[in-house]
Curated annotation (Swiss-Prot):
Its cofactor is Zn(2+). It is an enzyme of class 2 (transferase). It catalyses: 7-aminomethyl-7-carbaguanine + guanosine(34) in tRNA = 7-aminomethyl-7-carbaguanosine(34) in tRNA + guanine. Keywords: Glycosyltransferase, Metal-binding, Queuosine biosynthesis, Transferase, tRNA processing, Zinc. Pathway: tRNA modification; tRNA-queuosine biosynthesis. The gene is tgt. This is Queuine tRNA-ribosyltransferase.
């Protein structure tokens, strides 16, 4: 296996591209969607389930794992991979997005961000050095720098000031974790809100610091699709072509397709798992709201083309019954199915890019998932 951080480009189609990223726990074929395992678990699934659906990498959350059970405990017990029984690659976010989502419970300074725990109200400081230390304890394959995710609608003055802070924090993160240390990769994050020149400025500054990969943050925060695609189309090409590009927090099928078309390699989002728990399921015939009365006597499989256990074994009527009855099995089967759909969708996208027919594949999927879905 190549050294961690090796990024080998494969065939492309327009700006869409395939590649292979090597980490300490294996290689990842891109473009890739990363299921979110917030607290050391993808809700309702076992690691063997993730292997069965061919999940190539999962995401863990620094904020939640720091508060409970604690990063030092995880380190003492052998690191996050051993703790959760997953031997594939793991990316951990910096926890910044969760902290900034606390709004009134946090305060930003040059040193970092002070916040109150959502669990018990205790006060904590996330500095760049602290989030790096936490992620080193967790032992993730890819760690993210601390950044400020600017809220949608922030004015230019605030966005520009925040951009400078994010850059200074990125430098401190890099200093706290030198390139190549422990085989753990570190990705920088480009901010700049919805100002194209500030996005370009942020990209230049973050690239100058030097990271193993680069992420676009601050999108899918309340803006319209048109606004997101406009920024995405301009910002993605600013990121180095020879390093992985990561679009954070974006997961609707047509948004993944737009990201791939712009040259993005990695995506994460709670959408497929959260929607599963809400009874909204993705199929290759379109979206299914399993709680609808029309499925009460429907003996057909959820998706006859899907190889997941739920589709091979149960009817739509049974899946509806489980959901209406609030049975725990509903969450498990629905999650298993949705993540299988996303895994297959990305595999088909990679194949379409390799074969030079990505535009046709994108149009086919967008017809199934029109604007607003």
């Amino acid at each position: 296996m190549n050294a961690p951080g090796t990024f080998t480009l494969g065939p492309g189609d327009g700006s869409a591209r395939t590649a292979r990223l090597t980490t300490a726990h294996g290689e990842i074929e891109t473009p890739v969607f990363m299921p979110v395992g917030t607290q050391g678990t993808v809700k309702s699934l076992c690691p063997t389930d993730l292997q069965d659906i061919k999940a190539r990498i999962i995401l863990g959350n620094t904020y939640h794992l720091y508060l409970r059970p604690g990063d030092e405990l995880v380190a003492k017990l052998g690191g996050l991979h051993r703790f959760m029984g997953w031997d594939g690659p793991i990316l951990t976010d910096s926890g910044g997005f969760q902290v900034f989502s606390l709004s009134g419970l946090r305060r930003i300074t040059e040193e970092g961000v002070t916040f109150a725990s959502h669990i018990d109200g205790s006060k904590h400081l996330f500095s760049p050095e602290k989030v790096v230390s936490i992620q080193r304890n967790l032992g993730s394959d890819i760690m993210m720098v601390l950044d400020e995710c600017v809220p949608y609608g922030a004015d230019r003055a605030y966005t520009e000031k925040s951009l400078g802070l994010t850059t200074r924090w990125a430098r401190r993160c890099r200093k706290a974790h030198p390139a190549g240390d422990r085989g753990q990769l570190m990705f920088g994050i480009v901010q700049g809100g919805f100002f194209k020149d500030l996005r370009a400025q942020s990209a230049e500054q973050i690239i100058e610091v030097g990271f193993d990969g680069y992420a676009l943050g601050g999108l899918s925060v309340g803006e319209s699709r048109a606004e997101m695609y406009d920024i995405l189309g301009d910002a993605a090409p600013l990121l180095p072509a020879d390093r992985p590009r990561y679009l954070m927090g974006v997961g609707a099928p047509r948004d993944l397709l737009a990201g791939m078309a712009a040259g993005i390699d990695m995506f994460d989002c709670v959408l497929p798992t959260r929607n599963a728990r809400n009874g909204t399921l993705f199929t290759f015939q379109g979206k299914v709201n399993i709680k609808r009365a029309e499925y009460r006597e429907d003996d057909s499989p959820l998706d006859p083309t899907c190889p997941c256990y739920a589709c091979r074994t149960f009817s739509r009527a049974y899946l509806r019954h489980l959901y209406i009855a609030k049975e725990l099995l509903s969450y498990r089967l629905n999650t298993l199915h949705n993540l299988t759909f996303f895994s297959i969708m990305m595999e088909r996208a990679r194949q379409a890019i390799r074969e030079g027919r990505f535009a046709a594949y994108r149009a086919e999927m967008e017809a199934l998932y029109p604007e607003g879905e």
